[in-house]
Amino acid sequence: MTIDTELTNGSSESVPFVFIGGGNMAAAIIKGCQNKGFTPKSNIVIGVQTEKSAEKWRQLGYKNVFTNTLEMLERYSTAIYVICVKPQVFEEVVSSWPVNSRPEFIISVMAGVPLKVLNAKLPFVSGNTTIVRLMPNVASSIGAGASTMCYEKNEKIMNQDSHIELAREFAECVGTVELIPERCFNPAMAIGGSSPAWTFMYIESLADGAVAQGLGRAEAKRLAAQAVLGAAQMVLNSNSGFDIETQHFGSLKDMVCSPGGTTIEGVRALEKNGFRYAVMEAVVAASTKADEMAKSLAK
């Protein structure tokens, strides 16, 4: 469907999505929007740094592609802006934004940049601007992402509820989305955003262990990946008999562990080597790093 966004002047018209940044995450989100029929290609505007990148987008059928951010933002003064760049270049984005701009709706897809910093660093943000933080993950590229979203409730902002609903639908184009308080954003982002890398390491380790015992590499990789996928589906699928809201993961583990069997022996080895502690520390480390990035940007 084409998105019709109610504007504060009372009119209703199709408003473009302006992506500031056209890297991997922007590509995943845009692809998801197209796959879900969320908004047409003609309604997508993309700002990139090089002509080579711009040409790649044009070859995919996107005509509204710019290498000059200021020119793009001046031309699209009424839009839903999606800041999809690395935090390190955020200041450059700010300096490229027209000072007389008064955006109504901004979606930030930047790790470690809190709402307070966004409000402070974007001097043109008015009291009528809805800012949403959104953090998808790499699985968004196949429509299986786990996104985290937060915003600051402000009843003075016209149409904020409709903006938030639109942001949720936008995020759901690439998977699931959890709306959470910002104080929980960094640990949630560590789980949703960073954990795929750790999960790849886990799958790789499973395969390596089997290869060490003589199993072929290809078979080991397929079995390991499918085992992890199946375990996740058992957690999320109510048909498995597991209730994620009320039951402990240990009940699923216990289903597999027979007394004196091979699985419980493997659990013992994992516990001996600090498996759970290592995973917990990875989440804490990623979350702490995001906190440090936020403090650095706030200076």
From Swiss-Prot:
Its family remark reads: Belongs to the pyrroline-5-carboxylate reductase family.
The organism's lineage is: Eukaryota, Metazoa, Ecdysozoa, Nematoda, Chromadorea
What metabolic or biological pathway is this protein involved in? Amino-acid biosynthesis; L-proline biosynthesis; L-proline from L-glutamate 5-semialdehyde: step 1/1
Task: Please give the catalytic activity noted in the UniProt record.
Answer: L-proline + NADP(+) = (S)-1-pyrroline-5-carboxylate + NADPH + 2 H(+); L-proline + NAD(+) = (S)-1-pyrroline-5-carboxylate + NADH + 2 H(+)
Q: Which UniProt keywords apply?
A: Amino-acid biosynthesis, NADP, Oxidoreductase, Proline biosynthesis
Q: What is this protein called?
A: Putative pyrroline-5-carboxylate reductase 4
What molecular function terms (GO) are annotated for this protein?
pyrroline-5-carboxylate reductase activity
GO biological process, any: L-proline biosynthetic process
Enzyme's top EC category: oxidoreductase
Its domain of life reads: Eukaryota
Q: Does the keyword Amino-acid biosynthesis apply?
A: yes
Organism, as annotated: Caenorhabditis elegans
Q: Which residues form a coiled coil?
A: none
Q: What is its EC number?
A: 1.5.1.2
